[in-house]
UniProtKB/Swiss-Prot annotation:
Keyword Repeat on entry: no
Binding residue positions for chlorophyll a 5: 212, 230
Record text on subunit structure and interactions: Present in M heterotrimers. Forms heterotrimers with LHCB1, LHCB2, and LHCB5 proteins. The LHC complex consists of chlorophyll a-b binding proteins.
Biological function: The light-harvesting complex (LHC) functions as a light receptor, it captures and delivers excitation energy to photosystems with which it is closely associated. Modulates the rate of photosystem II (PSII) state transitions and influences PSII macrostructure. Involved in PSII excitation energy transfer and charge separation during photosynthesis in thylakoids.
UniProt-annotated binding residues for chlorophyll b 3: 155, 171
Positions contributing to chlorophyll b 1 binding: 55
Protein name (Swiss-Prot/TrEMBL): Chlorophyll a-b binding protein 3, chloroplastic
Residues reported to bind chlorophyll a 4: 216
Positions contributing to chlorophyll b 4 binding: 163, 174
Main location: plastid
Keywords: Chlorophyll, Chloroplast, Chromophore, Magnesium, Membrane, Metal-binding, Photosynthesis, Photosystem I, Photosystem II, Plastid, Thylakoid, Transit peptide, Transmembrane, Transmembrane helix
Binding-site residues for chlorophyll b 5, renumbered to this chain: 163, 261
Coiled-coil spans in chain: none
Length: 265
C-alpha cells in the first residue's frame, strides 16, 4: 500500500504509550495527522507490525514468531501457545471478536435498565439483569422497557423461538454474505446493513476501528465476568454495587466479600 505513494516526509508522531514521541515516515494511508489542531489520530504502526505496542511495553520479552502484528489486538502475548497453529489462531480470532461483541451488548444491557429506573424513572418491575428474565413467569408477564405497548411477553417458548430466528438470520447473513446484505467477510460483513454509516470505507480508519473494537470487547468480557461474580456474591446489580462502593469504599469492596468463597464460611 505504501508503495503507491512516491513521496513521503519524516514527522514526529506523538503516541499515547508512555508519552513517547517517535520519528516515522509519513504515509497518508498509514498515518493520519490533523495538522490544523493539536489532536492526532494514531498511526496504525502503533498497533500493527513488528514495532507495535507489546503487552509489557518496553519490558516485553521476545514475542512468538507467529505473532507478527498482522492482526488487530496482537500484543505479542501467548504464553500457552494457543495461537501457534495457524488454523487454531484463525478460529480463536473469530471467537474473540464474536464473543467480544456479545459481551459489549451484554454489558450495556446489564447496566441500562438500572440506569433508566434510577435516574430516568422508567418503571421496570425488575431492573437487575439476572432477575429480570424471571418476570416472564409472573402473572403479568414481562414488559420490555417496562412498557406493555412494546413487547408484552408471556411465553418463554415464544421468546426463545423469536430469539433463535432473529439471531439465525443475522448470523446467516454474516457468514454467507448474501447479495445486497453483506460483503462476504465473516467477521466484518460491511455493506449497507452492517455498516450503514460507511465507517469502514477508509482503510486507515477501518484498521484503527478494528483495534478499538477488540480492546473494548476484551474489556467487556472481563466486565461481564465481574457482573457474574457480583451477582453470586452480593445478589445485586452492577450499578447498585458501584453506588454502594462509592458510598463506602472501605466496607463495600471485594475484600469484604472474599470470605464468601471460603469453604464452610
Amino acid at each position: 500500500m505504501a508503495s503507491t505513494f512516491t513521496s513521503s516526509s519524516s514527522v514526529l508522531t506523538p503516541t499515547t504509550f508512555l508519552g513517547q514521541t517517535k520519528a516515522s515516515s509519513f504515509n497518508p494511508l498509514r498515518d493520519v495527522v490533523s495538522l490544523g489542531s493539536p489532536k492526532y489520530t494514531m498511526g496504525n504502526d502503533l498497533w500493527y507490525g513488528p514495532d507495535r505496542v507489546k503487552y509489557l511495553g518496553p519490558f516485553s520479552v521476545q514475542t512468538p514468531s507467529y505473532l507478527t502484528g498482522e492482526f488487530p489486538g496482537d500484543y505479542g502475548w501467548d504464553t500457552a501457545g494457543l495461537s501457534a497453529d495457524p488454523e487454531a489462531f484463525a478460529k480463536n480470532r473469530a471467537l474473540e471478536v464474536i464473543h467480544g461483541r456479545w459481551a459489549m451488548l451484554g454489558a450495556f444491557g446489564c447496566i441500562t435498565p438500572e440506569v433508566l429506573q434510577k435516574w430516568v424513572r422508567v418503571d421496570f418491575k425488575e431492573p437487575v439483569w439476572f432477575k429480570a428474565g424471571s418476570q416472564i413467569f409472573s402473572e403479568g408477564g414481562l414488559d420490555y422497557l417496562g412498557n406493555p405497548n412494546l413487547v408484552h411477553a408471556q411465553s418463554i417458548l415464544a421468546v426463545l423461538g423469536f430469539q433463535v430466528i432473529l439471531m439465525g438470520l443475522v448470523e446467516g447473513f454474516r457468514i454467507n454474505g448474501l447479495d445486497g446484505v453483506g460483503e462476504g467477510n465473516d467477521l466484518y460483513p460491511g455493506g449497507q446493513y452492517f455498516d450503514p454509516l460507511g465507517l469502514a470505507d477508509d482503510p486507515v480508519t477501518f484498521a484503527e476501528l478494528k483495534v478499538k473494537e477488540i480492546k473494548n470487547g476484551r474489556l467487556a468480557m472481563f466486565s461481564m465476568f465481574g457482573f457474574f461474580v457480583q451477582a453470586i456474591v452480593t445478589g445485586k446489580g452492577p450499578l447498585e454495587n458501584l453506588l454502594d462502593h462509592l458510598d463506602n469504599p472501605v466496607a463495600n469492596n471485594a475484600w469484604a466479600f472474599a470470605t464468601k468463597f471460603a469453604p464452610g464460611a
